[in-house]
Amino acid sequence: MADYTIPSELPPILKDLSREVLRHQPADLVQFCHDYFAKLLAQQRKVLMDSADPATKATIASTAGPAVDADEAARANSYAYSTDDGFGTEDDDDDDDDEDDEAAIPPPVVNRGRRTSVSAESMAPTAHDVDAVKTVIPKSDEQRARIQASIGNNFLFRNLDEDQYTDVVNAMAEKKVAAGEVVIRQGGVGDYFYVVETGALDVFVNRNGNGDVKVTDYSAGGSFGELALMYNAPRAATVVATAESVLWALDRVTFRRILMDHTSRKRRMYEAFLEEVPLLSSLEPYERHKIADALESVAYADGDVVIRQGDVGENFYIIEAGDAEVIKIDENGEEHHFRPLHKGNYFGELALLSDKPRVATIRAKGKLKCAKLGKKAFTRLLGPLADIMQRNTQDYEKYPGEH
């Protein structure tokens, strides 16, 4: 115990819990805490599912059922997706609703009723994780190019910074497998995460001892093995090569240090930033948690156009750093400049609220960094603030907030 380091995420979690206890003043404190953390866990799992590729979702869906206590899962999901917290609003006309339904299935419960040789680990990265010696496997330029091509569109690596991306490439090991070779086996210990460069692999799940059933397959660009590393759980499925394949393997330590620390730091950074945004000041901490998890950081150089007048609106933006120009062209073709936007200002909401084209152009004035929220997440997470944003449109004649 003397060497144990308190995870950096623990203090803010306990602080948020204390606020909720003071706000609700529950008669049964233990039950309240249980329900609070069940809700928080379900939200985190939904974030993972929302960002996962279809093959990963299929694997989770095929393995989640029997391992989860029905009452516990129902309670957790009811908290996570209840509209009582003001964040359950969905666009009924959205074609992606089926994907959200699938995302509601929780991943396998970790280590329920069984022992593995993997020591229990916190999902939150510790100081030891951050300070760990980096894995560097020598590679040729050709190998590095192949890795980059393989992971370029993978959801887990999409938002890493340059240093983290380099660490991933450095740590990956090439693994060649023959047709018929088992790469991972259900119930085994998870030591590696895999990305498929070439080849084909099938995924099988054995439920209740009734034999292996194929649930999905992987080809070039696919990836698997992250669930066991994220949740410290046994492998949820067996993956078998159906043709000669080339995989890139990322070890457990590097995976957790880079990917999970990135997620943790991103959340902490955005939560602190969102507290300073006036529009979001009325939200509860757990509501800002959800927004922080959904935001994506985008950077622009001087003169870059963020949104263009007349275009269809797909995203909502909050300025993290820098300044932006607001330009509107009237019906006579004359260009008008409005008051510039700064850190904490938001734009892009009007086109999403009204389904109308952009009414102005926003252009970076110097280096600009924004937090971006897609249309579907905007509707789901910022629905309760729609009235406030609609009221703000009355100021657009002197200071257009949509831009």
Curated annotation (Swiss-Prot):
Gene responsible for this protein: PKAR
Residues that, per the record, bind 3',5'-cyclic AMP 1: 156-278
Name of the protein: cAMP-dependent protein kinase regulatory subunit
Highest taxon in the source lineage: Eukaryota
Keywords: cAMP, cAMP-binding, Nucleotide-binding, Phosphoprotein, Repeat
Name of one Pfam family that matches: cNMP_binding
Record region (Disordered): 79-125
InterPro entries: cAMP-dep_PK_reg_su-like, cAMP_dep_PK_reg_su, cAMP_dep_PK_reg_su_I/II_a/b, cNMP-bd_CS, cNMP-bd_dom, cNMP-bd_dom_sf, RmlC-like_jellyroll
Organism: Blastocladiella emersonii (Aquatic fungus)
Entry GO MF terms: cAMP binding; cAMP-dependent protein kinase inhibitor activity; protein kinase A catalytic subunit binding
